[in-house]
Curated annotation (Swiss-Prot):
Single GO MF annotation: ubiquinol-cytochrome-c reductase activity
Species per Swiss-Prot/TrEMBL record: Hyaena hyaena (Striped hyena)
UniProtKB keywords: Electron transport, Heme, Iron, Membrane, Metal-binding, Mitochondrion, Mitochondrion inner membrane, Respiratory chain, Transmembrane, Transmembrane helix, Transport, Ubiquinone
Subunit: The cytochrome bc1 complex contains 11 subunits: 3 respiratory subunits (MT-CYB, CYC1 and UQCRFS1), 2 core proteins (UQCRC1 and UQCRC2) and 6 low-molecular weight proteins (UQCRH/QCR6, UQCRB/QCR7, UQCRQ/QCR8, UQCR10/QCR9, UQCR11/QCR10 and a cleavage product of UQCRFS1). This cytochrome bc1 complex then forms a dimer.
Cofactor(s) listed: heme b
Pfam families: Cytochrom_B_C, Cytochrome_B
Membrane topology category: Multi-pass membrane protein
Magnesium listed as a keyword: no
GO CC annotations on file: mitochondrial inner membrane; respiratory chain complex III
UniProt-recorded name of the protein: Cytochrome b
Biological role stated in the UniProt entry: Component of the ubiquinol-cytochrome c reductase complex (complex III or cytochrome b-c1 complex) that is part of the mitochondrial respiratory chain. The b-c1 complex mediates electron transfer from ubiquinol to cytochrome c. Contributes to the generation of a proton gradient across the mitochondrial membrane that is then used for ATP synthesis.
Amino acid sequence: MTNIRKSHPLIKIVNESFIDLPTPSNISAWWNFGSLLGICLILQILTGLFLAMHYTSDTTTAFSSVTHICRDVNYGWIIRYMHANGASMFFICLFMHAGRGMYYGSYTFSETWNIGILLLFTVMATAFMGYVLPWGQMSFWGATVITNLLSAIPYIGTNLVEWIWGGFSVDKATLTRFFAFHFILPFIILALAIIHLLFLHETGSNNPSGMTSDTDKIPFHPYYTIKDILGLLLLILMLMLLVLFSPDLLGDPDNYTPANPLNTPPHIKPEWYFLFAYAILRSIPNKLGGVLALILSILILAVVPLLHTSKQRGMMFRPISQCLFWLLVADLLTLTWIGGQPVEHPFITIGQLASIMYFSIILILMPISGIIENHLLKW
């Protein structure tokens, strides 16, 4: 009799995706982040579901309902902080996962890569709308500033912003629809993640060497299930250290003040994981130009496969490209720091230089380094 995991229509899909999946024998810990992202997503959906049971999406009671969750609901505080800090963990894993894709040339799987970019946009939209829900000062003003950027679109901009707001300012209608979207989007993300995996399993995984590994595959279980569990334990350790010891470390103190349309906070800034894009947005004095730069800062990932000039897939044996890659990482950290600073003299210039650097490395320097390294191979 055939084993049930190989014959049952449903279990067979799970078996081919997580048990008998042929996997390269040499993939490193950088390949752990995909499974960690899946776990983060499930964690966010579950904690979010329990929060939604007690949350009210009304401007008069939203702030109070979040306070009620933290004070009166059984273990409400831990659910709320796991959800808030879980988002930070989600983005750390996302950046690591995308960075690994860039470093090892995984972007040559163009369908998987493009679905990944779409996933990144969707997760960013979800996180932004989630940040609005507690209805604190930074929630309200963050929503006002970011949605207002759409008014830079010629001709239809103003109408578009008012349509999204559901009125002439960020108010009850905005909060209600943001809650609805914030609830539905994670399930769309889940569907996209399944498509992402579907495309990946068409080609099989890449590996650190960038060479084909068809001759050297091992089953996913038990080798990589054990490896993923180790990654999961480290993720949970980091998350719980944050949640239990300094839950507000990554948040903004202004969000503990109820939203007040008559009082603007001195520095309006998004959560830390958007600061790099926010810095790029602010570095351009023109409103429409800034919005375009903001969108392009993520959309630029779509042209990375087109700009691949090297004969080698990954950067494992390409020292010049490696230097540029780590320069790009340092540049993104600089942009993240600048995004959290006030718009004053040294920070403006640093932000502009870092923004130019960001686009230059990806669009100009990386392709040139690939060509140079091709010539070095002939020596």
